[in-house]
């Protein structure tokens, strides 16, 4: 009953307890389908128009392609309530400038499960002129096991420094996009034949 991505997003937005909808542009991956930027922009516009919740847009994890994607999508969705994942150390200038400075939208600052890297990236983004009120931290994510525990430990350290030490460079909200990580865990992709005891 969902013919398009926008239909899926509308259905997801209507679910009880949903605060926002995340659109992952995996089809843009140059090592996969390599969907053109223009097609991804049209998809993002359709999803944004279909939902009444804030929209989070995640790229395809290709630094070059994501830079092109976020700039064009931010331009097309100017004035909308959108958070873009993610600005990383390798591309923060382009992403933060295109999304935050040029179009006044929100930027996710992605670091690799390390409080010092998270703070450093926040400082760098603020130094290019982006208001920290438009930054959301993505301190890393994991779906299970030690990785998840390490992510939670990092988040606790960030919150502790932000609150007890009044560290303004760690006082941004945190988002942890775990959903995509779940598909890299063997329990999610194992067939019933491989692991019959899991059902």
How does the language model describe each region?
Residues 1, 19-23, 53-59, 80-87, ...:
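Hydrophobic faces of well-ordered beta-strands that scaffold small-molecule active sites
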Residues 4, 32-42, 65, 113-116, ...:
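Alpha-helix N-cap and loop-to-helix initiation/capping positions
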Residues 12, 73, 137:
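Conserved, mostly hydrophobic/aromatic
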Residues 17-46, 51, 57-63:
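Glycine-rich, proline-tolerant flexible connector loops at the mouths of alpha/beta enzymes
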Residues 36-45, 71-81, 192-198:
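Short, electropositive alpha-helical surface patch
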Residues 90-199:
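Catalytic alpha/beta core domains of metabolic enzymes, predominantly
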């Amino acid at each position: 009953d969902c013919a398009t991505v926008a239909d899926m997003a509308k259905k997801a937005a209507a679910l009880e307890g949903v605060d926002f909808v995340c659109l992952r542009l995996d089809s843009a991956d140059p090592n996969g389908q390599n969907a053109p930027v223009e097609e991804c922009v049209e998809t993002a516009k359709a999803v944004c128009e279909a939902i009444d919740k804030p929209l989070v847009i995640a790229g395809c994890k290709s630094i070059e392609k994501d830079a092109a994607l976020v700039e064009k999508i931010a331009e097309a969705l100017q004035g909308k309530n959108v958070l873009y994942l993610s600005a990383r150390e390798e591309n923060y200038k382009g992403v933060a400038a295109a999304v935050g400075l040029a179009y006044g939208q929100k930027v996710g600052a992605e670091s690799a499960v390390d409080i010092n890297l998270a703070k450093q990236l926040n400082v760098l983004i603020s130094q290019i002129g982006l208001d920290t009120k438009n930054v959301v931290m993505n301190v890393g994510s994991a779906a299970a096991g030690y990785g998840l525990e390490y992510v939670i430990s990092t988040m606790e350290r960030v919150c502790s420094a932000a609150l007890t030490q009044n560290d303004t460079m760690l006082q941004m909200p945190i988002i942890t996009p775990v959903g995509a990580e779940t598909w890299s865990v063997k329990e999610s992709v194992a067939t019933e034949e491989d692991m019959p005891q899991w059902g």
